[in-house]
């Protein structure tokens, strides 16, 4: 624990195109090697692609996808008397959003489509329909928490 206390959270600016902080967070997750304009081009292209396929506002589609991917529970390692237990804990709202965005981007990078724009758009669309690898990751996380429910009394 730092002596000065926790570092203050920096305020996120709203995205200039959609006016959404979620889109800004998504751009920052796609960002690699400081190439922000490339990350913005990828995200905006993916959202436009999603708009063409669904005919609805892409930010609403993104929010629906995130709601389907956000975990409610996760497991944390806790050492008790020489044994390490996987203890299920509830996920804070900001962490669940961060995890959902991280999973969306990482699983879209593993997809087979030709461009990153197509991969991200299809992963967002799949997640908004309750399909895709990122939704499966959430289900696996919940299954792991449920399987280790016996250790919930070690929560801190």
Swiss-Prot record:
Alphabetical list of CDD domains matching this protein: uS7_Bacteria
Biological processes annotated in GO: translation
Record's GO cellular component terms: small ribosomal subunit
InterPro entries: Ribosomal_uS7 (IPR000235), Ribosomal_uS7_bac/org-type (IPR005717), Ribosomal_uS7_CS (IPR020606), Ribosomal_uS7_dom (IPR023798), Ribosomal_uS7_dom_sf (IPR036823)
Keyword Cell membrane included in the entry's annotation: no
A GO MF term: rRNA binding
Keywords: Ribonucleoprotein, Ribosomal protein, RNA-binding, rRNA-binding, tRNA-binding
Function as written in the Swiss-Prot or TrEMBL entry: One of the primary rRNA binding proteins, it binds directly to 16S rRNA where it nucleates assembly of the head domain of the 30S subunit. Is located at the subunit interface close to the decoding center, probably blocks exit of the E-site tRNA.
The protein's assembly and partners: Part of the 30S ribosomal subunit. Contacts proteins S9 and S11.
Protein family membership: Belongs to the universal ribosomal protein uS7 family.
Descriptive protein name: Small ribosomal subunit protein uS7
Provenance organism: Mycolicibacterium paratuberculosis (strain ATCC BAA-968 / K-10)
Lineage start: Bacteria, Bacillati, Actinomycetota, Actinomycetes, Mycobacteriales
């Amino acid at each position: 624990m730092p002596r000065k206390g926790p570092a203050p959270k920096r305020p996120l600016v709203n995205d200039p195109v959609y006016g959404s902080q979620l889109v800004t967070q998504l751009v920052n997750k796609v960002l690699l090697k400081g190439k922000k304009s490339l990350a913005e081009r990828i995200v905006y292209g993916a959202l436009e692609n999603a708009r063409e396929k669904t005919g609805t506002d892409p930010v609403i589609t993104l929010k629906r996808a995130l709601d389907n991917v956000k975990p409610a529970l996760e497991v944390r390692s806790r050492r008790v008397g020489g044994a390490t237990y996987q203890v299920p804990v509830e996920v804070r709202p900001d962490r669940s959003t961060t995890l959902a965005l991280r999973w969306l981007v990482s699983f879209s990078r593993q997809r087979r489509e030709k461009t990153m724009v197509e991969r991200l758009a299809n992963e967002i669309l799949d997640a908004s329909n309750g399909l895709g690898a990122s939704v499966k990751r959430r289900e696996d996380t919940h299954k792991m928490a449920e399987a280790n429910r016996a250790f919930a009394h070690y929560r801190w």
